[in-house]
Structure formats: C-alpha cells, structure tokens
Amino acid sequence: MDNVVLIGKKPVMNYVVAVLTQLTSNDEVIIKARGKAINKAVDVAEMIRNRFIKDIKIKKIEIGTDKVKNPDGREVNVSTIEIVLAK
C-alpha cells in the first residue's frame, strides 16, 4: 500500500510531487480520493500525464460509493475514485 497517494485538502502540486516520488520506485501508483477531492485527483493525474511524464498510461479508473456516518449519526453516501497510473 506504499504506492497509494490519498488526495485531501493540500495544494495540487503537493500530490503531484508525491506521485512522482512514488513513480521513482514503483511502476504503478494509485491515486485515491473521496467527495470534493475527486476533482483534485483528476487534476493530479492529468498534470502528471500532460506536463511531467508524457508516456505514462492510465491503467484503470474505478468509481464507487462509500457509506460514511456524519456527526449526526446518519449514514451518507460519499463518492470515491481510484486512478491507477502505470509506466
């Protein structure tokens, strides 16, 4: 699981650097995000593909839904994405 980058609230370039670092030692990197961070995950994948490593491939994209309990105790659905980049 060391080749997984979880996308959160930091700036996009932080995650781009994290993915590039993972790609130096792994042939595949998994970018994961939930909820509002999904667009940032797509931005990270596209920046790497278009600006840094032109020949990298998007091996797989999975979308789904997680059930999460909010502070009120109710279950809410949160969208998820998993993007697999491969050399």
From Swiss-Prot:
GO CC terms in record: chromosome; cytoplasm
Residues where N6-acetyllysine is found: K9
UniProt keyword annotations, A-Z: Acetylation, Chromosome, Cytoplasm, DNA condensation, DNA-binding
Post-translational modification: Acetylated. Acetylation at Lys-9 decreases DNA-binding affinity.
Localization: Cytoplasm; Chromosome
Annotated family: Belongs to the histone-like Alba family.
Known function: Binds double-stranded DNA tightly but without sequence specificity. Involved in DNA compaction.
Protein name: DNA/RNA-binding protein Alba
